[in-house]
Amino acid sequence: MSEENINKNEFPELKNDTFLKACRGEEVPYVPVWIMRQAGRYLPEFKSVRADVDFFSVCRTPELACKVTLQPLDRFPLDAAIIFSDILVVPQAMGIEVQMIPGKGPFFPNPIRTIEDLSRVQFPVDVNKELGYVFDALTLTRKRLEGRVPLIGFTGAPWTLMTYCIEGSGGTTMSNSKSWLYKHPAESHKFLSMLTRVCIDYLLGQIKAGAQALQIFDSWSNELSPAMFKEYCLPYLVQIGKEVKAVHPEIPLICFAKGSNFALEDLSKSGAYDVLGIDWTIEPSVAREMVADRVSLQGNLDPCVLYCGDQVIRDQTQKMLQSFGTTKRLIANLGHGMHPTHPIEGPESYVKAVHELSKQMINK
């Protein structure tokens, strides 16, 4: 940990609260924008950090995690920072080995394949001991931000984390994890409950460390039917939101259940979240109709638009903003994360277009 004083009571005053206002549904001078995976391999300065250090070492070294979190903010006028980490630090905290294979992604040498394997999972988890490095990174980053923009913390959702633990990697047919739900419903709920408890404790720890908003990533929820989502995703997502809100009602919570568009109405009525993220598979106008004014929406530009040059990006951004129907209760983002191959000019054009076009819409 740096010698720098990171006393949590001495955080600098926030200068740009546009993102937090949009989360709460308050009036804003323009639509705020941040981008999932805004710190990442598309940035040459990130590659230079990674040249000497493996992925999880960056996550586990607060000084490095802070450095890469701030990199995109030094390039683009983003309205929020998101701490550099990974959703798979939660399984690691539960004693499950996770490796990050260059060019391939996460790999679990010993996945949870049988109900007997559940006995290998460490539970309960002391999050301060196992994930304290994330908390240290948050506190350091919050101080080094100097109040420029709010700092977002995050976790993976229980179903998505369970999927990785059982499959052993991403990009599969999900046959192992989905069949678990059918073959072992009781054990599935047990595993999901364990993951949920760790996620809640982890998120509460992140708030204590300095996170000013939180996002829950359910990246694989789109693999489930509406009925299976209602049984194995929704209750745990709602539990996380409600338990965190019971302690910290002032902290905005964002839920991004990727591709589970059918769940938007239920999630918006749950009272567990302030913001729902959407991807590009739903028209913003349809999403807005489903959630009414109960929550704010976040999204939803197709990341592939960022390959296409300034004019296409601007045109598509305008279509997106117009489809949302109002600049209130809106946070601009992509429908998923940045790609490693994205040109730097892509996010630069997108952020500029969101700010300029939304100001024009508001000032009409």
From Swiss-Prot:
Enzyme class: lyase
GO BP terms in the entry: heme biosynthetic process; protoporphyrinogen IX biosynthetic process
Any one GO MF annotation of this record: uroporphyrinogen decarboxylase activity
Xref: SUPFAM superfamilies: UROD/MetE-like
Compartment list: Cytoplasm
UniProt-listed InterPro entries: UROD/MetE-like_sf, Uroporphyrinogen_deCO2ase_HemE, Uroporphyrinogen_deCOase
Catalytic activity, EC: 4.1.1.37
Site (Transition state stabilizer): D86
PROSITE patterns, A to Z: UROD_1, UROD_2
Reactions accelerated catalytically: uroporphyrinogen III + 4 H(+) = coproporphyrinogen III + 4 CO2
Binding site for substrate: R37, Q38, A39, G40, R41, F55, S85, D86, Y164, S219, H336
GO cellular component, one term: cytosol
Keywords in alphabetical order: Cytoplasm, Decarboxylase, Heme biosynthesis, Lyase, Porphyrin biosynthesis
Pathway(s) annotated for this protein in UniProt: Porphyrin-containing compound metabolism; protoporphyrin-IX biosynthesis; coproporphyrinogen-III from 5-aminolevulinate: step 4/4
Primary location: cytoplasm
Subunit structure: Homodimer.
Function according to Swiss-Prot or TrEMBL: Catalyzes the decarboxylation of four acetate groups of uroporphyrinogen-III to yield coproporphyrinogen-III.
Family assignment from sequence similarity: Belongs to the uroporphyrinogen decarboxylase family.
Protein name per UniProt: Uroporphyrinogen decarboxylase
Gene: hemE
